[in-house]
């Protein structure tokens, strides 16, 4: 048995130890629960995020569908097969070439376009006559002709291999139609003739 005086000193020490133990337990629980992540309240997702998920993460802006944006235009190429003749001789094999006389349309409207659909209504609002299908690339090809007497002839001809669309303004269109009605230009008087005329006028005045 311990004397009462020692019990008097041990009691506060026991209380201090008890408080430290409780503090240690509290610290442990705080550390334990500090790693728990609080659930984030669910916010309604916007339409843009849904569109990005459906479209595979691609961003589509409204500027891509603007009516004022430039559209790439292409030719609907026409392919022809014909024989070449000079009146007496005719080509042995037919000649295949491109004829750049088709209609100029936006690339998404062309039949060989792989991309998605494009509104033809938008294109119909624009003046399709501003664009013309013209020759883009050509190459020289030799072709052999068979004559009626059995002889052969070889000619070099230019074959169109690619077409392109060229834009013409209204001035070009008007000039192409009205070039015949233009009045002939006045003959230009040279500087020497003017000097001679001025000298002759001076002599006549004197």
Curated annotation (Swiss-Prot):
Subcellular location: Secreted
One GO cellular component term: extracellular space
InterPro entries for the chain: Cys_knot_C (IPR006207), Cystine-knot_cytokine (IPR029034), Sclerostin/SOSTDC1 (IPR008835)
Biological process terms in GO annotation: canonical Wnt signaling pathway; epithelial cell fate commitment; hair follicle morphogenesis; mammary gland bud morphogenesis; negative regulation of BMP signaling pathway; negative regulation of canonical Wnt signaling pathway; negative regulation of cell fate commitment; negative regulation of determination of dorsal identity
One of the record's GO molecular function terms: BMP receptor activity
Tissue: Highly expressed in kidney and weakly in lung.
Signal as UniProt keyword: yes
Coiled-coil regions listed in the entry: none
Keywords attached to this entry: Disulfide bond, Glycoprotein, Secreted, Signal, Wnt signaling pathway
Keyword Glycoprotein annotated: yes
Glycosylation site list: 47, 173
CTCK domain residues: 75-170
Signal peptide (UniProt feature, chain positions): 1-23
Composition bias type Basic residues, residue spans: 188-206
Any Pfam family matching the protein: Sclerostin
Region (Disordered) residue spans: 174-206
Family per record: Belongs to the sclerostin family.
The protein's role, per its UniProt record: May be involved in the onset of endometrial receptivity for implantation/sensitization for the decidual cell reaction Enhances Wnt signaling and inhibits TGF-beta signaling. Directly antagonizes activity of BMP2, BMP4, BMP6 and BMP7 in a dose-dependent manner.
Protein name: Sclerostin domain-containing protein 1
């Amino acid at each position: 048995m311990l004397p009462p005086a020692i019990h008097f000193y041990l009691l506060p020490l026991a209380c201090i130890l008890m408080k430290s133990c409780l503090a240690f337990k509290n610290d442990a629980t705080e550390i334990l629960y500090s790693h728990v992540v609080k659930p984030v309240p669910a916010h309604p997702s916007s339409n843009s995020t849904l569109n990005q998920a459906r479209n595979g993460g691609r961003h589509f802006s409204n500027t891509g569908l603007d009516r004022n944006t430039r559209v790439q235009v292409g030719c609907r190429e026409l392919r022809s097969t014909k024989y070449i003749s000079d009146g007496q001789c005719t080509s042995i094999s037919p000649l295949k070439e491109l004829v750049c006389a088709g209609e100029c349309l936006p690339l998404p409207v062309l039949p060989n376009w792989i991309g998605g659909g494009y509104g033809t209504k938008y294109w119909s609002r624009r003046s399709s006559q501003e664009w013309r299908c013209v020759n883009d690339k050509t190459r020289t090809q030799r072709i052999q002709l068979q004559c009626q007497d059995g002889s052969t002839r070889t000619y070099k001809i230019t074959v169109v291999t690619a077409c392109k669309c060229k834009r013409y303004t209204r001035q070009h269109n008007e000039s192409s139609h009205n070039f015949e009605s233009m009045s002939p230009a006045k003959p230009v008087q040279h500087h020497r003739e003017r000097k001679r005329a001025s000298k002759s006028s001076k002599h006549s005045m004197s």
